[in-house]
Amino acid sequence: DNCDINCLAEGMEDNGSGVALVLELARIMSSYVYDHTIVFMTVTGEEQGLVGSNAFADYAVTQNIPIKAVLNNDIVGGIICGETSSPPSCPGLNHIDSTQVRLFSFGGFNSAHKSLNRFIKLEYQEMIRPLAPVPMMLTIMSAEDRTGRGSDHIPFRENGYAAIRFTSANEHGNADVA
């Protein structure tokens, strides 16, 4: 793309930011050895009905693929209200917040999904936050997603897998331009 930093880039936040994060996680984590296989996946067709995530979740079930957890990064880069995010999640124009992360998941307090959220938050607080130059605030949300909305973690949950969604506190809307 030959646009400079001032060009409009619809889609960069939903979900270009999530794709960039998945690629960077794969790059960094490829240097280590793990006891289990980690799949770094991006899917298409979320706005058209979770097409890609439904397809892979259904495939995983029919092929008996053991998935321990699904961590969905959807809309994770919007930090400036009015540029990369818009109401209702923004408290005001030009408000900047790169330190708040919301964790959405299905079920009650003891569900596998909420337990996964609590585990991630605890591990972050004990292992990562003390080393972070700018600490993050992780907030476990009570709902599976925003009202009337859905993301790519839902088809995995519907197929019996523990699944959560990470998202920025300042979330995008239809007025985003960056």
Located regions from the model:
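Extracytoplasmic/cell-surface-exposed regions of Actinobacterial cell-envelope-associated
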Residues: 11, 32-34, 135-143, 170
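Acidic side chains
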Residues: 1-4, 13-15, 72-74, 152, ...
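His/Asp/Glu-rich mid-to-C-terminal helical/loop segments that flank catalytic regions of hydrolases
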Residues: 169-178
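Active-site proximal loops enriched in glycine and acidic residues that flank catalytic Cys/His/Asp
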Residues: 42, 167-170
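Short, mixed-charge, low-aromatic patches
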Residues: 12-15, 159-160, 164-166
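Metal-dependent peptidase/peptidase-like ectodomains
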Residues: 43-154, 159, 163
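Catalytic-core environment of secreted peptidases
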Residues: 1-41
